[in-house]
Amino acid sequence: MKKLIFSVLFCCVAIVASAQVQRPKLVVGIVIDQMRWDYLYYYYDKFGEGGMKRLINEGFSCDNQMVNYVPTVTGVGHASLYTGAGPATNGIASNDFRMGDKMVYCCDDPSVQGVGTTSKSAQMSPHYMLGTTIGDMLRQATDFKAKVFGVAIKDRAAILPAGHSANGAFWYDKSVAGFVTSSYYMDKLPDYVVKFNKQNTLKKGYDPKSHADGVTVTFDMAEAIMKAEKLGQNGTTDMLCVSISSTDAISHQTGTWCSPGKENEEVFLTLDRDIKKFFDALDAQVGKDGYLLFLTADHAGTHNPNTQREHKLVGGSWDKTATLRQVNEALSKKFGVEGKYFNTSVGFSLYLDHAFLAQNNLDIEAVKAAAIAELKKVPELITAVDYEKAAVAALPQWIRERIINGYYKGRSGDIYAVVKANYFDWNVKPGFYGSTHGSWNPADTHIPLIFMGWNVKPGKTTRLTNMVDTAPTVCAMLHVQAPDASTGNPIVEVVDQK
């Protein structure tokens, strides 16, 4: 009888053990700001062993990963990646957007104070983001035992990925030459951040965002967080969100690989060396099979039109300022009222001055229609679209769905200007070779997405996947609910690997 009871108990324990939710010790998200998908292969032969090559060779790559909304900019990209939602449901309409009579920054929060700095620029939180993130859902699923942190040089790149319930988010403040946070997360910096800042060799006033050493200081801070917080060693699944900002700033200044300088190559080879060191630290702390890692980008980047034209390729610039001045003059003439009909433009999103129109009893629908008619005459534009009528616009589905997915009423503009492929939204002068992003075309929307580590086998798919699929995929692998505002779907080739 005793043997029978023991056997039954053993079987019960075995069944319970096998039924336990299987999760990695740590989830790591790495976002490379303004990384084009083709950088993976353009720089492959120059990458060393153990870094980006390891990721490409050991990971599962979604080679047709696209951003499925506009605008393709940093704040929106980081919010969308981790919420699984575009601006239409997560509310982050751009880096900066208009709400009523004022412009706001996507992370501004005057109700909180900077911690580690007296700068007002550290008064930041994710309160404008209307969706939860991967980390929020992981925290909720573990009764808030999971630790979740975000780190980047750019504040929005640390804050938005980490989510609303994060244990901390740290970003770089050049005025103190170190990482800071806000009272949204904590009242004082942890001792390990204070120590890191004291040991930082970068001088006050120096901006690592514009230099390759910004990559190094970010990964070093990420490693410091990981070790001090014992991420992956707390008996539950933790999460670390890392974003590399220097790749974007340097590309804006000096361009993609197509531009004359070597700055783009320098920063991506620095990334390769530093990510190897970071992988080694992860392996040592939680084991190669102990963490689930994904690397992606918030958006890609367009080759400079000067470079394009030198090689007889398509590219150009749209002088938006001149266009809006001309359209304003045409509207003043048509409606017989002098004034400023547009009060803001953010990228390709144009905001009418609703207060001015109301004060002069001008019908907004009539003004929109007249403005669009004028914009359609501009040779650098394919067309212009009333955001609220985008669903019936005579445009390819590719463009139309991106306009719809990127529109949040009350934060986005009134009209979206559809620029030609590889066109900048300002007048590019001769001799300038920097890059930009923000538009609908594949140069800005085609980004890398590679998974590596826990429960991931090497491979790839060229099936179309979207940025908003990233969060549902990670959540499905973790067996937690997808974020609240999510509109994406799990990537079955990743989730269902056998």
Residue ranges of model-derived segments:
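Active-site His/acidic residue clusters
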Residues: I159-F170, K230-L271, T307-R309
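Substrate-binding rim/cap in mid-to-C-terminal beta-strand-loop elements of soluble/periplasmic
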Residues: A322-N361, S435-L478, V492-K498
